[in-house]
Amino acid sequence: MDTQAFRRSLHHSDRYNRRGFDSPTKRAQALEEAYQSDLISSIRDNGFTYNKGRLNIKLAKAFGFCWGVERAVAMAYETRRHYPNENIWITNEIIHNPSVNDHLRKMNVKFISAKNGIKDFSLVSNGDVVILPAFGATVQEMKLLHEKGCHIIDTTCPWVSKVWHTVEKHKKHVFTSIIHGKFKHEETLATSSFAGKYLVVLDLEEANYISEYILGRGNRNEFMNKFAKACSDGFDPDKDLDRVGVANQTTMLKSETEEIGKVFEKTMLKKFGPENLNSHFLAFNTICDATEERQDAMFSLVDEDLDILVVIGGFNSSNTTHLQEIAITKNITSFHIDTPERISVEENSILHKPLGLDLELKNNFLPSGNINVGITSGASTPDKVVADVIEKLTVIAS
């Protein structure tokens, strides 16, 4: 499929909307009423610090809702107001935040069900309204919904769309897209649907493994078994890794994406020589500004004198998970929670998710004496949620 041509035609359809319905001023006011916090505003004004008794809280200098998330959430709410009586569906969680998604359910926005990773669009009918989430949707889903005669409200983050343009450029010039991401993640599924040949790479270890194969030091069967679910149909590592371009899931760790890009650039340089590098490697710039800002702020926060660190965000949120990884690299005791309800004031306990593990209950997690607590949150976490966490910590400390 010519994905560029399809997107152009979709954008000209009178059943497609990617701008929303409210003015920017009205949109900002609605979000402020729903999710902003006076406490968080005052903490920002106080140099991102908050002192209450024995508790000293230090907030990351960039955290919480990014503008892409704000835009998606606002457009979803606007859609219900604009279509008060129509069936409204959403193809996935609007963002990775349970409270926001629960609010949409209360507004009678229906979520497309999925079984074994396959979405069921059978209940979606002509004239229904369908919201595409901030992560985007696959081109196949867009085509299906367009053919069904649905009104499509596209809240895809522009940074995600930028990555789609990048992989389409790779396809046009017959380059394989190396996508730094998680192959099951909604954003990467969408991005790969716009690519030609592609290979999804999780981390630096996998990048180095592929590099070794490109340089002739690998086993084909082992390679294909390793990446069976992370590559395009008919992928041939002996042919499709001669010309590569790098792109990324926008929520991945910035420093790792850059390192992976360097691995493939050096590999192609070694195999084909400097005079042929541009024919075999395409440079990239698809790192999201908001992701970069939050990660940089987290690196600064973990350099502070902290006793514990609380990371707030959906458990399936990639950008939040990477913030937790930064804390772990500094050996700081950290707790990843998705809602304030994970903290029990009465028990001084926290039900948190260690990286890569199941939920775990930690009793007496807030120690006695003076304590320095670092706090950050993922790009899908409203300020009000962060404020509720701080208020619970304050009560425990008192």
UniProtKB/Swiss-Prot annotation:
Q: Which InterPro entries does its entry note? A: LytB/IspH
Which cysteines share a disulfide bond? none
Taken from the record, one Pfam family name reads LYTB
Residues that coordinate or bind [4Fe-4S] cluster: 66, 157, 288
Cofactors, names only:
[4Fe-4S] cluster
Write down how the cofactor binds this protein.
Answer: Binds 1 [4Fe-4S] cluster per subunit.
Any one GO MF term held by the record is:
4-hydroxy-3-methylbut-2-enyl diphosphate reductase activity
Chain positions recorded as dimethylallyl diphosphate binding sites: 96, 185, 317-319, 380
Task: Provide the E.C. number(s) assigned to this enzyme.
Answer: 1.17.7.4
Report the superkingdom from the record.
Bacteria
Q: Where is the active site?
A: 187
Keyword terms, alphabetized: 4Fe-4S, Iron, Iron-sulfur, Isoprene biosynthesis, Metal-binding, Oxidoreductase
BP terms from Gene Ontology: dimethylallyl diphosphate biosynthetic process; isopentenyl diphosphate biosynthetic process, methylerythritol 4-phosphate pathway; terpenoid biosynthetic process
Q: In which pathway does it act?
A: Isoprenoid biosynthesis; dimethylallyl diphosphate biosynthesis; dimethylallyl diphosphate from (2E)-4-hydroxy-3-methylbutenyl diphosphate: step 1/1; Isoprenoid biosynthesis; isopentenyl diphosphate biosynthesis via DXP pathway; isopentenyl diphosphate from 1-deoxy-D-xylulose 5-phosphate: step 6/6
The record, for HAMAP family, names: IspH (MF_00191)
So what family is this one in?
Belongs to the IspH family.
Role played: Catalyzes the conversion of 1-hydroxy-2-methyl-2-(E)-butenyl 4-diphosphate (HMBPP) into a mixture of isopentenyl diphosphate (IPP) and dimethylallyl diphosphate (DMAPP). Acts in the terminal step of the DOXP/MEP pathway for isoprenoid precursor biosynthesis.
Q: What is this protein called?
A: 4-hydroxy-3-methylbut-2-enyl diphosphate reductase
Q: Which organism is it from?
A: Prochlorococcus marinus (strain MIT 9312)
Q: What is the lineage of its organism?
A: Bacteria, Bacillati, Cyanobacteriota, Cyanophyceae, Synechococcales
Encoded by which gene? ispH
